[in-house]
């Protein structure tokens, strides 16, 4: 039977537990009768529970002792907080365990499994032991957001993408279900000051590993020139020094060398996590009374602060500045207790940031030079700022087209080509497809509609505003609690500001929802639930149900392993091609929801089929049919995916050209006609998809429509003057046209 919790200081548990606890208390420790006061404060009490310190001044905190199942759930949550930020695939040399995506896919797998463990263990704890269910009206808004996202997913242009999220992003409905679980479980268990502090400490410790690794990736940028100078002028060495403190064998990076990316694989994704690492650690610094721990937290804060600079991500600089301003304002109100060592370490934070910035000023790279990077924030008509505005413009047009339910969560890549401006190809290059808006407000509005976006930010404000009011009110007795809350609050604000210019990924956003849960706990109420006699069958059923998504998660991880192998084996020989194809097909079988897996299968089948046709092999017909079936599956999986039509066109045009070279004009015409007919509506829908337009031009050329093909190629060249393939195709076609004209002009003279 459920009972509402009446008193803030009342303890909940079985009569035996309460009696045993009372007997264990000395007369001096016995709680005094609660006094009703105008500010609703109650006396401090103690409990034998872990994290038993009661902080009544910041809300209706739990006094209930955690059961064994409760402790398991709480520490499982802490384990998740520690593991997810550092989770990545370290097994680069082990072909049996390596995955293609070493970062986001691993973090999402840990989150999916971990959230299921949390949900099931909480349910078992509740059914077996009874206890509190803490609640708040914000649950209704979270439920509304999830329901709205569910409807948006059903009506999405790609329901599978909207549910699972795009490959390496995973910002679909499943991730938001995970966030809701984390938010709920946090509210149930992180209910005392000591537990809150333990959560913050766990996060800070995880950030130490993440930030230290990021620092190692940056250090060679200053050590190499220094050691080269010393070697040249002291030891007369002629060769330059090239240190590599990162022991993992990264290949060519898609961003500037020596930018910190750590366990997130991208500096801009690392930046989001640093919002939590910096500000949560700041709260720990100012709340800690023990000198040794205070020194440790300062060291962690300095390392996090340095990596915030070395990541060279402007979004976290802006977000960090806003978060710091808020933290300073609140700290001025609270007047934290400063130790003498704080002044030195505070100066160390500033000095470390200044030194990192100064060492970059000699760099000619606009990105690596700190001053150039800062000033580029205000240069709206050039560089990445220009492309961001163009992407935002495309997002606004996408929102106008479907303002209610949007296009589906995390589907922006699928619709970007339909709304991108003509100038984007000149700014970013014809191959660049924006898979994210880089503005989370617009990303949400385009994905789940304006209503869904408003629901998300309503949740943010519902938590942030009361938390600010709480942190503004000074309290000498509970100053440590206030410091922790100020750090958590500043982290939430900094991360949300970062998202206005960055990307939301589960590996960082899961912390947002956990911290939101911590901040809302003081405003929650509790309902007491009695144990139930049918706990065993209910628990067994919950475990069996949870095994289904857990199995899917493991299959998806295995699929990415096969996807890696398909790329690693290569296509240098017939046997390697066959092995790669088998691995690609295994990836598609294990995870049929990812377009890029199917595209790889199509690409390998195309190569194998074209070779068979060229050699007039007996299995050419069977391979052709198999490739066509794979193309159909790829296009059906996501009809809006631009690259899918590109891979299909490679096959159709390739087959047309192959049969043309063999003199089979009938088959050549069939494939050129098919390519032109299938690509024509896509060119109308995605007019600035220049790579696809080039394939369309080649199909038109195969049909003999030279003038129309030239018109398409001129559009490509105008769209991106650096599109060399289009320029070469245009010049070659002009040459052919000129030769045909010359031959036609010479024909009458020969007859005479």
Kindly give the residue locations of the regions a language model identified.
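C-terminal luminal/periplasmic domains and tails of membrane-associated envelope-modifying transferases
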Residues: 2-6, 564-752
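Non-cytosolic membrane-interface motifs at loop->transmembrane helix junctions
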Residues: 101-102, 163-173
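Short, hydrophobic transmembrane alpha-helix segments
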Residues: 88-106, 126-132, 289
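Alpha-helical transmembrane segments of multi-pass inner-membrane proteins
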Residues: 2-3, 8-35, 44-46, 50-90, ...
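Interfacial juxtamembrane loops and adjacent helix segments
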Residues: 221-263, 368-389, 393-401, 409-446, ...
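Flexible interhelical linker loops that connect adjacent transmembrane helices
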Residues: 522-536
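Hydrophobic alpha-helical transmembrane segments in integral membrane proteins
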Residues: 360-369, 534-575, 596-600
